[in-house]
Curated annotation (Swiss-Prot):
Free-text tissue specificity from the UniProt record: Ejaculatory duct of adult males.
Source organism of the structure: Drosophila melanogaster (Fruit fly)
Described purpose of this protein according to its UniProt entry: Male-specific peptide with moderate activity against Gram-positive bacteria.
Protein name per the record: Andropin
UniProt gene name: Anp
UniProt effect for mutating residue 9 to F: In strain: B316
Induction: In response to mating.
Family that this chain belongs to: Belongs to the andropin family.
A Pfam entry, by short name: Cecropin
Amino acid sequence: MKYFVVLVVLALILAISVGPSDAVFIDILDKVENAIHNAAQVGIGFAKPFEKLINPK
């Protein structure tokens, strides 16, 4: 989650500093951020069944 917050902050700083003319960089950074977020969600989805096997309630 920390990496996601760092990427959001960096995207905001970059968006403010470059302005609307260089929005391509923001688009690329946004796509990378979304890919990392989706990968983290998939990883959590894979980990939950193993967690339930190890720690049954």
